[in-house]
């Protein structure tokens, strides 16, 4: 299930975001969390409250889903190519079978290790499995397959009051959250992101 975070301030992005998803993605269940539900959004919606703690609201929204796995998304994650469904299912099976992993990021972003995940040429550890996270890029708001409960646990532990990526290092280390990222020598775009 896609799990998209958005805000009504970003409504100018909805048409291209949902349009590109429809064009390039297989039919995957989709829930959007938003500060105020909108008829412009063509899928299930859960309302969060701007004036409440961001992490608590986010984790509450996740708890409303039945699925055990979600694909973390935001309204500016535009698809430019068809989703590799077989690869997505392969990565989901890896998450299901490996208790040491909590997520697989579907893009190379940030400062990450170059240590390969055994038996997979396109998967690398965000941080080597025998090391603690030391960089804020260990958590990245990028397209990511998450074990839903681990994402809930992380947001509860981090407990940020506002939207953002800071403050996740200590909670990730405390909870033992480890993950992988996908990379197949895609072209670099900007300072830290790659095509994927």
Which residues make up each language-model segment?
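Short beta-strand-to-loop acidic/aromatic patch adjacent to the donor-nucleotide binding site
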Residues: 68-80
């Amino acid at each position: 299930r896609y799990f998209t975070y958005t805000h009504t301030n970003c409504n100018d992005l909805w048409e291209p975001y949902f349009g590109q998803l429809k064009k390039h993605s297989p039919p995957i269940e989709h829930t959007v969390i938003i500060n105020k539900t909108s008829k412009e959004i063509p899928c299930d919606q859960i309302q969060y409250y701007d004036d409440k703690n961001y992490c608590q609201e986010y984790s509450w929204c996740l708890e409303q889903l039945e699925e055990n796995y979600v694909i973390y998304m935001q309204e500016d994650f535009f698809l430019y190519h068809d989703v590799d469904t077989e690869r997505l299912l392969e990565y989901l099976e890896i998450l299901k079978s490996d208790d040491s992993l909590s997520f697989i990021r579907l893009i190379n972003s940030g400062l990450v290790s170059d240590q390969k995940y055994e038996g997979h040429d396109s998967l690398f550890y965000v941080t080597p499995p025998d090391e603690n996270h030391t960089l804020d890029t260990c958590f990245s708001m990028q397209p990511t397959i998450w074990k839903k409960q681990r994402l809930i646990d992380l947001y509860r532990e981090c407990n940020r009051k506002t939207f953002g990526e800071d403050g996740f290092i200590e909670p990730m280390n405390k909870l033992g959250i480890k993950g992988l990222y996908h990379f197949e020598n895609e072209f670099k775009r900007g300072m830290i992101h790659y095509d994927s």
